[in-house]
Amino acid sequence: MKAWRGVLIALSFLLLSGCLVTFKEPPPASDPAPKGLLGKWSGINAWGEPMSLELTRVGNDRYQAVTYFKAKPREREAYPFTVSHHGSRWYLSAKVPGRFGGHYTIAGFELTDKRELVVYNLDLEQINQAIQHKALDGQAFQTDDGDGVQVDSNLDKVFAYLDDPANSDVFVEAVRYQRQNSAK
C-alpha cells in the first residue's frame, strides 16, 4: 500500500480507505470549483502525519492539488483534478497512474461552516457489494500494492448509485483539512 501513499494522499481527497476504486471514464469537467475550495489547507493523514495541501486553478474547470508532508516541505507532488456536482454532493476526479490501471478515481468532498475541507473515499467493500448485487458493473483487480476494483458502469449509472441517499454509507471520511488562510 505504501507505493499508493503519494498518489492517494495527494488525492487523499481521493482515496484512502486503503484500497483503490477506479472508473473507466471521468465525470465531465464542466463545473467550476465551489467558492472556498481553492487555497491552502493543512491536516493529518490516515497515518497521523501532518500534511499541507494547496489547491489552485490551472485552466477552465481544471485544478491542481500540490501536497507535501510538513516534515518534508521540499518534497512536493502535484496532481491535476476536476470537480463535478451531482445531486447534493460535490466530487473530485483524477487520473490514476498507469501502474494502477490508468483509469480515474472519484471522491466526494464538502466544505464545512468550520472552514474545513472534508474528503470522502469510496469504500472498496461497499463498491464490491454493489457489483455483486448488480447495482454497478465492474471487476476486482490486484496490484503489488494492494486490492482494487474497477467500475465499468457508465457515469449515469454510477452517479445514480452514489447520489442515492440509501448508499450514503459508501462514502468514508478519508481526511479533514483546515483552511490555512482566506478562501479564494
Regions from the PLM with identified roles:
Residues M1-L8:
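Bacterial N-terminal signal peptides that target proteins for export
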Residues L15-G18:
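C-terminal motif of bacterial Sec signal peptides marking the signal peptidase cleavage site
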Residues L20-G36, I44-M51, T56-V58, R62-K184:
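Calycin-type beta-barrel ligand-binding domains and close structural analogs
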